[in-house]
Each structure stands twice: as structure tokens, then as C-alpha cells.
């Protein structure tokens, strides 16, 4: 006011587009974000990021690799594979991507909506938003595969990733895992005794590049929070068995932590409680929890075995196919290739039914959850993001997704004999039906007051297909999708959908007869498409 009033500009004080004053205690915060500070000498800021640690990617490179039971190992010396070789690690709540170049992404509950550390930009990247290195001969040397002249052996094991690297006289082994029941990722480092260690990461915490990030440092702990968080109130904690010496940078939002390593060093980050994190940072606890993770996967993957004479196929089928289905498709729903985060109506139903020989619980939960994501009209959310305030997803005119509920229910009952599932009540969703001009709609639907047994949810899906109509050849319309999203706007009739529709109708009629429920004859009578499809095959 003392400056503006004498020149007749006092009306600008506190007015829209005018001049505002901030409390003195806000000065440092304002300066830290300002592009220019008038009246002060220009300071020189140095980015936190050290010179590139990553190796080159060669389009023709296929690393030497081998199998040892469930352990897949490959060796990198200067040249990385053409694309990132990755490994998904998750406990169903917290998830991480391990890559040849080291940790390559971390998320809480939803990989797309709640990344804690974003993954690399694409599958050809040779760098990551998280780096871990030691200084050797005055130069940074990554603990992972990199262009530094040191060979690195990378091993992927169910629930764990391992990097082994000899740097000078130190044979360093770094293991990454996520304990069951704890929302924290652990890096357990052996052999880096007395080497100064630098840990750099660019937290996102649900926002874009950590644009709005609050960082607080306490003894032995760093706390991060963001108003942009997909899950309000969730904080990210960082801790270690070693003393933390942290500094921050703004563009991109970065964190550099210096540590002095011991014979074993534990680095932890995640969304667990402070008490849990501090306990997890002790080497004995970390090793014990890693053993529990290994035991969990051994129990699950050991229930199926294939012998076919093809060693490569046997290695894949005897554990890895199941692991990737559970960890990547069902629990993690992410990879560098596609970090979706959402649950799909048809995708996870197919994945979980394929696990019936392993664990029926996955399929049972998917069937019930899909019933909860069906509208009273019979159509469904094609995919959705779970959220405590109500799931958000896309309502479409997709022509096949709803039928996978019918297929999954019939497969489940036939394989398990658990008929009781058919009579569990689940609510529908409620929202205005799509308008004629709407191709699809992203929304947060309400939970309907109407509910029905799982059997009736399946019946509603079949009836919805009938109501959508048939073309002049007696075949159902393609709609949008038809199990091929590239056909969203093609239109016409679909032989494939007619076949699948007829198959589901037959199976459902058999299920009704098995249960002694009404409607089996009507189902078969109503689906004239059964006869039409035979004419086209």
C-alpha cells in the first residue's frame, strides 16, 4: 500500500488481477517456486540428476539367459535388451516393476491413478525415475544394469528380483520384494559395506510428475504427501536401516538421499504406517519377510505341473504362466507396456477362470465383483477404477463383455460344483442409459437399490443381448467391440458373436436345468441364433 497508494493505484491491492501480499513466513516457499526474484542476485541451481547411468539398447541384443527351476537369469554387459525386460512384483495392494535397469515404477492400489514413482516413458527407455548408485573412482556406478563397464546378472524369481554386480572389491547383491500384508517395497542390499550410496527418485504420489508434493524429513524417515493424491490422505514414507541425508529438487520433483552402507542395508518406501516401516528397515525383519514371500508363491505355483518334452514350454507353464496371470493381470494390472490399473469386465474374468485348477478364489471374487459392476439393464462397465468414494469406469455399447459373466459362471459351477455361488445376492449399478448419440460414457455410477442373485445377473446379461437385436441374417449386431476393440465403429452382424452368444445360451440353459431353476426351455427357444449360426459355419 505504501508504494501503490501515492501513485493512485491503491485499487489494485487485493483485487482480481491486482497485487497481493503474502505473509513473511511464506517468502522462502515463494522464492523456491519463482522463476525470477527481483532485487536479489541470481542463484545458480544444479539439477539433482547425475550423468546418465543407463546402458544403450541394441535392437538386435538378446542377453545370455538361463533357467534354474523358477529362477530366470540373464546377464547384461554394457548393452541392454532391445526392450525393457521387466518383472511385476505385488502383494495385491502395493505393486512395483523391476527391470534390467533396476526399480522402474511403484504404485499403491492402482498403477494408473496412484503411482508413487512413475514408470519409464516407454519400453525402449534406458533410464528410470529411480536410480541407486555408488561412487567408484570418482564416477557414479549403478547397482543395476548400466553403461558403466561393470557386468550385471539379473534374476527374476516369483515375488522377487535380484541384481548382482561386482564393483571394485565389492560383490553387491540387491533384492527387491514386497511383503505380504504390508504396503511397502523393500530393497535389501548385501555387500556394499562402507560404500557411500546415493538413492535418487522422482516421486509422483498420484499427481503428475510430483508437481504438488510436500516433503517432510524426520530422524530416519522421510514423509511425502500430495493434494493431488487419488486416495486422499495417503502418504508415502521412505526409510532405511542407514541414516538418511536427503536433499530435494523441484523440476522434476526429485529426492536425493545419501547413505553410508553396512554389511546389509535396507531401503524401504511405501504407504504403510511409520511403525511398520521402521520395523521393516531392520535386516532381520526384511530377510524373514522375503522368506515368507517366497513361501507364498511356492505354495501357489506348486499346485500345477506340466511335462511335455519341451523344456522351454515346461519352464514357462510350470509356474511362470500362473505367476504372470496373478501378479501382472489380476493383482498388479500393470506393466511398462500398459499401465492400466483398471479392472476389466471380460479380461479378468478370463484370467481368473483360467486359474480354477490353481485357486478357485480368484474366479469367485471376479464373478461377484463383475455382478456388482452390472447395470440393472444388463449391460456392464467395460472397465473401472476402484475408489473408496465410488468406482469410476466406462459404460459402453460393447457387444461381448457382458456375456463373459455367463461363460465364467457356467465354467465355475461345472469345475467346482459350488452351486451356492449362483444364489448370492449382489446389487446392480444405476445411471441414465446411454443416449442414442453417446458411444460410451466415463462416469461414477451409483449403487442401485435393486439387487439380484448371481444367476439372475447372468440371465440379465443374456436378455440384454437379445434386446439389442439381430440383423437381417439373424445374427447379433457387432455393437462396439465384439472382442476386438478395433471394430468399435464397424457395425454390421457378427458370426463370432453369434457363436459365442449361442454357446453361452446353451451352457446357461444346462446350468438352469442343473439347478432346477425356471427358464431353461425359454432360453433355448428364444435364442433362434443357435440355428442361424450353424448355417454360417
Regions found by a protein language model. Name each.
Residues 166-168, 477-480, 491, 495, ...:
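Conserved alpha/beta enzyme-core scaffolds, especially Rossmann-like or related mixed alpha/beta domains
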Residues 155, 301-342, 365-387, 454-490, ...:
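Extended glycan-interaction surfaces of carbohydrate-active proteins
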Residues 1-346, 361, 366-369, 411-415:
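Anionic coordination/interaction segments
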Residues 347-351, 490-493, 519-524:
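Alpha-helical scaffold segments that form or flank carboxylate-/histidine-based iron centers
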Residues 313, 363, 398, 458, ...:
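Hydrophobic packing residues in well-ordered alpha-helices of helical domains and bundles
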Residues 352-471, 495-498, 502:
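Aromatic-rich carbohydrate-recognition surfaces in CAZymes
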Residues 343, 489-500, 526:
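Short, contiguous, pocket-lining structural segments
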Amino acid at each position: 500500500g505504501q508504494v501503490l497508494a501515492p501513485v493512485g493505484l491503491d485499487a489494485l491491492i487485493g483485487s482480481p488481477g491486482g497485487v497481493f501480499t503474502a505473509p513473511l513466513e511464506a517468502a522462502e516457499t515463494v522464492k523456491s517456486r519463482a522463476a525470477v526474484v527481483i532485487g536479489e542476485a541470481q542463484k545458480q541451481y544444479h539439477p539433482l540428476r547425475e550423468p546418465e547411468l543407463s546402458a544403450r539398447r541394441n535392437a538386435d541384443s538378446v542377453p545370455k539367459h538361463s533357467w534354474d527351476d523358477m529362477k530366470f537369469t540373464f546377464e547384461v554387459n554394457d548393452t541392454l535388451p532391445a526392450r525393457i525386460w521387466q518383472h511385476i512384483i505385488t502383494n495385491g495392494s502395493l505393486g512395483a516393476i523391476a527391470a534390467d535397469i533396476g526399480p522402474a515404477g511403484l504404485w499403491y492400489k492402482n498403477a494408473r491413478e496412484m503411482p508413487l514413482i512413475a514408470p519409464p516413458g516407454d519400453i525402449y527407455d534406458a533410464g528410470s525415475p529411480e536410480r541407486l548408485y555408488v561412487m567408484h573412482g570418482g564416477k557414479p556406478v549403478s547397482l543395476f544394469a548400466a553403461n558403466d563397464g561393470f557386468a550385471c546378472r539379473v534374476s527374476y524369481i516369483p515375488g522377487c528380483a535380484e541384481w548382482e554386480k561386482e564393483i571394485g572389491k565389492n560383490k553387491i547383491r540387491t533384492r527387491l520384494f514386497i511383503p505380504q500384508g504390508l504396503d511397502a517395497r523393500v530393497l535389501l542390499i548385501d555387500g556394499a559395506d562402507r560404500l557411500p550410496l546415493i538413492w535418487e527418485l522422482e516421486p509422483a504420489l498420484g499427481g503428475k510428475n510430483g508437481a504438488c508434493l510436500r516433503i517432510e524429513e524426520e530422524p530416519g524417515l522421510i514423509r511425502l504427501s500430495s493434494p493431488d493424491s487419488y486416495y486422499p490422505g495417503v502418504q508415502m514414507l521412505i526409510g532405511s536401516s542407514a541414516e538418511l541425508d536427503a536433499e530435494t529438487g523441484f523440476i522434476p520433483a526429485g529426492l536425493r538421499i545419501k547413505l553410508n552402507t553396512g554389511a546389509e542395508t535396507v531401503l524401504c518406501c511405501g504407504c504403510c504406517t511409520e511403525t511398520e516401516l521402521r520395523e521393516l528397515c531392520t535386516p532381520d525383519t526384511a530377510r524373514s519377510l522375503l522368506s515368507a514371500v517366497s513361501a507364498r508363491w511356492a505354495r501357489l505355483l506348486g499346485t500345477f505341473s506340466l511335462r511335455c518334452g519341451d523344456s522351454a514350454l515346461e519352464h514357462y507353464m510350470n509356474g511362470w504362466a500362473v505367476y504372470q496371470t496373478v501378479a501382472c493381470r489380476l493383482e498388479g494390472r500393470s506393466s511398462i507396456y500398459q499401465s492400466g490399473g483398471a479392472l476389466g469386465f471380460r479380461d479378468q474374468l478370463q484370467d481368473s477362470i483360467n486359474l480354477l485348477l490353481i485357486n478357485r478364489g480368484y474366479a469367485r471374487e471376479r464373478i461377484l465383483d463383475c455382478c456388482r459392476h452390472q447395470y440393472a439393464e444388463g449391460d456392464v462397465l467395460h472397465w473401472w477404477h476402484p475408489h473408496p468414494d465410488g468406482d469410476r469406469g466406462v459404460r459402453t455399447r460393447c457387444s461381448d463383455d457382458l456375456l463373459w459373466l455367463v461363460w465364467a459362471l457356467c465354467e465355475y459351477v461345472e469345475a467346482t460344483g459350488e452351486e451356492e455361488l449362483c444364489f448370492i445376492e449382489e446389487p446392480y449399478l444405476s445411471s441414465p442409459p446411454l443416449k442414442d448419440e453417446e458411444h460410451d460414457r466415463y462416469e461414477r455410477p451409483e449403487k442401485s437399490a435393486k439387487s439380484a442373485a448371481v444367476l439372475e445377473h447372468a440371465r440379465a446379461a443374456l436378455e440384454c443381448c437379445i434386446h439389442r437385436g439381430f440383423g437381417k441374417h439373424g445374427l447379433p449386431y457387432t455393437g462396439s467391440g465384439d472382442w476386438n476393440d478395433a471394430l468399435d465403429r464397424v457395425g454390421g452382424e457378427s458370426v463370432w458373436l453369434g457363436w459365442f452368444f449361442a454357446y453361452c445360451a446353451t451352457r446357461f440353459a444346462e446350468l438352469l436345468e442343473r439347478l432346477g431353476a425356471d427358464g431353461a426351455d425359454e432360453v433355448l427357444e428364444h435364442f433362434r441364433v443357435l440355428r442361424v449360426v450353424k448355417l454360417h459355419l
